[in-house]
Amino acid sequence: MAHAIPRPAEEIPLVPGRARSVRLGSTLPRVMDCAYGSPMAVDGDVRTGGDCGGGEGLYPTSTDTAAHAVSLPRSVGEFASAVRAMSADAADALRRGAGPPPEIWPRAYRMFCELFGRYAVSPMPVFHSADPLRRAVGRYLVDLGAAPVETHAELSTRLLFCAHWCCLGHAFGCSRQAMYERECARFFEARLGIGETPPADSERYWVALLDMAGADPELFPRHAAAAAYLRTRGRKLPLPLPPQAGSATVSVASQSINF
């Protein structure tokens, strides 16, 4: 039984001057998305020839849950709600094939600067391990400026960082931490250049150290001196002369530690 051989689908180049092509039809929006410099660009790696994701993962902040929203600190609740609404508007524009609404980022930026300004000058009665991260993220967002964003990829990422800043306020009780794991890890590693994000139990670690230091202020100097002594003996280097009364000096790899 003979089968009709379908005609090959028409193909168009992805970007002028490149041999790669895609089929017309349902994939046409992806061609628009992947066009470098287009407002519909959804993949930050298009410049290097990475595959376009089609926008499926953009604007995750538009799907926040009521349970998560009420768990946020009251100081950020209004801004988090606005970010959720702006993300939904931008996602709707993406579905309609329109570029990112130009008014969204200037509005989000203005609201964030007001909120972060109050946060930055407010006293911190108790140290929280997420505070340095919040300040780093906040300063980065402030430095971006209020100019409208040209691509959906960049707008989605900025709104995600805004939501991440809010969620750092309940860093150890956030129910949507998985939303930040991939993108915000890249943020710390690439955009700020400060390495991997701290482990979730970092606060417990530092609290324990502070408690130990408070109970015995000489504990860590004694341990440091002992560690330096053992390290020096392990290298079979000559030990330094006994220090003068009232002070202790340990030489380690051409450096001196005074206690």
Swiss-Prot record:
InterPro entries listed in its UniProt record: EHV_Unk
Compartments, record wording: Virion tegument; Host nucleus matrix
Induction behaviour: Expressed late in the infection cycle.
| Domain of life from the UniProt record | Viruses
Q: Name one Pfam family in it.
A: Gene66
* One cellular component (GO) term of this entry: viral tegument
Provenance organism: Equine herpesvirus 4 (strain 1942) (EHV-4)
* PTM statement from Swiss-Prot or TrEMBL: Phosphorylated.
Record flagged with keyword Metal-binding: yes
Similarity remark: Belongs to the herpesviridae US10 family.
Q: Name one GO molecular function term.
A: zinc ion binding
Query: Under what name is this protein listed?
Result: Virion protein US10 homolog
Zinc fingers (unnamed): which spans?
Answer: 162-174
UniProt keywords (A-Z) are:
Host nucleus, Late protein, Metal-binding, Virion, Virion tegument, Zinc, Zinc-finger
